[in-house]
Amino acid sequence: MSHGKQFTLFSLKPGPNGWHVAFILEELGLTYENVFPNLDVTAHQGPEDLVKYNPNGRIPALIDHGNNDFVIWESGAINQYIVDRYDKERKISLAPGTEEYYTQLQWLYFQASGQGPYFGQLVWFAAYHPEKPQSVLDRYTNEIKRVFGVLEGVLSKQEWLVGNKPTVADISFCSWNEIITTTVLQNFNFEKEFPVTAKWHKKILARPAIKKVWDERAKLLAQG
């Protein structure tokens, strides 16, 4: 690809997963080009230009042109690859091999398995499914609140998830948290129900790199 930047990031304008990869790239000052495939979220098979790089046909996928066009997909794996390879000063990550490093992995896995699927299923049933079964909506809403409860319990005792500083672990939760609390959950007051988690989330969202990326997303969505 001829854009001259180190990375190509396959993403989706409204969806959260590509954007939290962009958060990490931006935090580390790494150059990247967003590519938005014509992805139908209701289709079982992704477009050919995406399947070429990700056999699962979903975003995100990342090409590292500085590493022989190495391709990696799944947002948690991508973020771990980026910080392990490029965050040599440990600005937003912990040193491999340390106990804190594995705690960081723990939270990345929890985000990928505990936050993303439940939050994503609520979006699916609330926005795309032809029927709106209340029992299903309640199921995923309750799971989302359970995840927030896990975060609330931990963050009530410490400022950040691991390492006494904001890391890739904290940042990985941000895009889904913002989307679900501002556009999907009904009759939900984040600050009232989970005040510590809401405060933590706002601190992450206010970081210059995060704000820059999220503002870019807003502009793209406004353009249609």
Where are these regions (language model features)?
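Residue-level recognition of oxygen-bearing side chains
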Residues: 77, 196, 209
